[in-house]
């Protein structure tokens, strides 16, 4: 990874929830390159350990810790383990999140006759699936913040970054739970920024647009490599006309927000990184 922005994070302890995920693993690599000790919190420990080993092989310092961000006892145990291994947390990236098909609709629009049709409409959304998405994204941001922000109180240069989405501004069709959860993240980021403003903790968020990754490749491209119909709609609604580069264009924004020389007066904001998607009216 070639970083164009490289703040000095030596001596800092960075905690990344969902750290072995497709996007958050890029944050882990970037943080380690900047000199931070990185705690990779991941529900599947083996994935976190594989990433930590990769970081160490490249000269960085990282350890993996098992953590279910929706379970307070699991989060507390992870916090204690990180304290014992690395010391107090300086940087928290609340990266754990995701969607669940049980919380989706099959169609973009509800039409006459859909009640009787063999399709999943708004009225068929599974309650437990909806709760799962809200818990994973919103409660999964609340609980780690409650645990790790305690380490930051009254200390210089401590920062929390939440992961929102362009869904937070205008919800995408078919995914109401995920869109609602990310809208809540924007509001919560503002609340936290005000709440912690007197004790030296900055709180911001990034709102990624569409990035082509292995995780979403099947949704964006057909087996022959041609774009799906949904990809065509996405790119048509993205003024820059392309997908983002997670290595450069997400990690760069995160490192900027972590840079206390450049961003020390920035708190309570959510930065869209979406090629203009959230700004475009469609005409």
Question: Model features per residue range: what roles?
Answer:
Residues 145, 181:
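Active-site helix of classical SDR
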Residues 124, 128, 226-248:
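Catalytic Tyr-x(3-8)-Lys segment
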Residues 150, 194-195:
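Alpha-helical segment proximal to the catalytic Tyr-Lys
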Residues 243-273, 278:
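C-terminal substrate-recognition "lid" of short-chain dehydrogenase/reductases
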Residues 7-39:
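Canonical Rossmann dinucleotide-binding motif of NAD(H)/NADP(H)-dependent dehydrogenases/reductases
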């Amino acid at each position: 990874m070639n970083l164009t922005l490289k703040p000095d994070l030596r001596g800092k302890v960075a905690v990344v929830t969902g750290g072995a995920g497709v996007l958050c693993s890029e944050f882990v690599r970037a943080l380690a390159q900047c000199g931070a000790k990185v705690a990779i919190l991941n529900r599947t420990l083996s994935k976190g350990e594989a990433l930590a080993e990769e970081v160490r092989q490249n000269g960085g310092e990282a350890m993996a810790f098992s953590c279910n961000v929706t379970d307070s006892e699991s989060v507390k145990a992870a916090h204690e383990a990180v304290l014992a291994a690395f010391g107090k947390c300086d940087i928290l990236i609340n990266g754990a999140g995701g969607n669940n098909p049980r919380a989706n609709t099959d169609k973009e629009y509800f039409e006459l006759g859909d009640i009787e049709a063999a399709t999943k409409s708004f009225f068929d959304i599974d309650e437990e699936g909806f709760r799962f998405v809200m818990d994973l994204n919103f409660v999964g941001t609340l609980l780690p913040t409650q645990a790790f922000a305690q380490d930051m109180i009254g200390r210089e240069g401590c920062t929390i970054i939440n992961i929102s989405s362009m869904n937070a501004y205008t919800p995408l069709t078919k995914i109401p739970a995920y869109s609602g959860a990310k809208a809540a993240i924007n509001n919560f980021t503002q609340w936290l920024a005000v709440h912690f403003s007197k004790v030296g903790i900055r709180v911001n968020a990034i709102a990624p647009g569409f990035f082509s990754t292995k995780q979403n490749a099947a949704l964006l491209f057909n087996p022959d490599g041609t774009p799906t119909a949904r990809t065509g709609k996405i790119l048509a609604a993205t003024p820059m006309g392309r997908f983002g580069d997670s290595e450069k264009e997400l990690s760069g924004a995160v490192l900027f927000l972590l840079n206390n020389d450049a961003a020390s007066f920035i708190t309570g904001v959510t930065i869209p990184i979406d090629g203009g998607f959230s700004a475009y009216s469609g005409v």
